[in-house]
Amino acid sequence: FQTSIRAEVLEGHVQTSDNVSIAYDVYKASHDEVVILAHGWFMTKNSNAFSQMAEDFSKYYDVIVLDFRGHGKSSGKYTFGSKEVEDIKPIINYAKRNYKKVYLIGFSLGSLISVDYCSKNNNVDKLILVSAPTDFDKIENNVLSPNAFVPTLRKFEYKRWTSIRFSLSALKRNKIKPINEIKNIKIPTLFIAGENDPIIYKWHNSMLYDASISENKQAILIKKGKHAEDLYLEAPQTFIDTCVSWLNKS
């Protein structure tokens, strides 16, 4: 159900199995279901896009948004998906203890981490993947292209950008391949992509959808849409309505 109550925002930290401190915010509005928002690279829980999105989702669910390692108020260095699944484990454990249903929404590299988690665990009720890559190696050369980097610069927030810390050595590690891991996920899954995404081209969405073994799956291509959180920023209420409508289906 929808509520007009403004969410109370509570800050917290959890410790990962490899001793990284992960910062998170809980938007509490007395719902018994929760949405977890998993951001991509160069985003944080306090970036304008995700704080606004969390407020909007909190009309329908409680919301948890975290900073992956090397981002925002979390410690450690970002490893481009190599270790970030450890960041989300204690967040989901917290959610399972406190809510009737847990939904996970991953954006860009956050969707890669979400696929990695859900392929190995069965304690998430529904999964939404926004601008998910089939394979990290298929996107890394697109990130610094003008079409990709200019929209990122438009969202420039000094405090956020200067908080990012990453491990260059992690780029050499074996990376997660969602196209393989999606075959282990049976829960309801929604795949969302932008028609004009300059980083993760729309064919990634189609390939992941086709490879999915979920009996309850749907793929949505947003006309003229761009990348990840931009799909929300370009049409906030439409994006929220799309997600809420799908999550509320039995």
Language-model regions: role of each:
Residues 185, 191-193, 197:
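Short beta-strand/loop motif that positions the catalytic acidic residue
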Residues 69-96:
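Catalytic nucleophile-loop/oxyanion-hole region of alpha/beta-hydrolase
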Residues 198-204:
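Conserved alpha/beta-hydrolase "acid-adjacent" motif
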Residues 41-54:
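The serine-hydrolase catalytic nucleophile loop
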Residues 225-236:
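Catalytic histidine-centered segment of alpha/beta-hydrolase-like enzymes
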Residues 1-15, 20-26:
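An N-terminal hydrophobic leader/cap segment in hydrolases
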Residues 119-171:
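Hydrolase active-site cap/lid region
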Residues 54-75:
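Conserved alpha/beta-hydrolase
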